[in-house]
Amino acid sequence: TACFSFYATKNMTTGEGGMVVTDDDEIAAKARLLRSHGEASKYEHVIVGYNFRMTEMAAAIGLVQLKKLEGWVRKRRENAKVLTKGLEGIEGLVPPAEGNWMVHSYYQYIVRAEPGFPLSRDEIVSTLTEEGVGCRPSYPAPLYKQKALRDLKVRGKCPVAEQVIGRLFELPVHPAVGPKDLETIVEAVDRLAKPS
């Protein structure tokens, strides 16, 4: 069982929404109920559900996007490889790594600034943004620290995430990023590591 988001910034989009795939009949039946107001048959609601039905237009967009996905991921991976090579020599920054057991899709290219880096994450983002580099801070907190989940008392279960999350920022590697853009990004980040 897996879930996929088709939000506008994802590797593949239908504008909004997502998809659940499963080989478990029970999960499939529950997902179908939840997506259509909990309706088991016409006007018979057996659980509280939602309106998660995808429109035919969104599905058609998704089918076209799906044919392009492999090429888009390949381009993201190529861009990430160039960016990683350019950032590897910059002291105090840790680009994302790809283990030999995985294939990264680079939906996001997240860089970690080490505590000794001369600028904070927010200063990095602000400076790069001023220089025209599409940069943003990564997520502000682990999911369990969000208001909706805080009272479930799951605190402290991800100490490494809590330690590094305030030092993570994202750089662009989407398919529209070209070689000159990557060069500009690396040069701008390199200047941050050598403040005047």
Task: Mark where each language-model region is.
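Short glycine-enriched loop/turn motifs at secondary-structure junctions
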Residues: 11-15, 103-105
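Conserved RNP beta-strands of RNA recognition motif
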Residues: 17-22
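PLP-dependent aminotransferase class I/II
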Residues: 23-196
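Conserved active-site segment immediately N-terminal to the catalytic lysine
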Residues: 1-13, 41-46
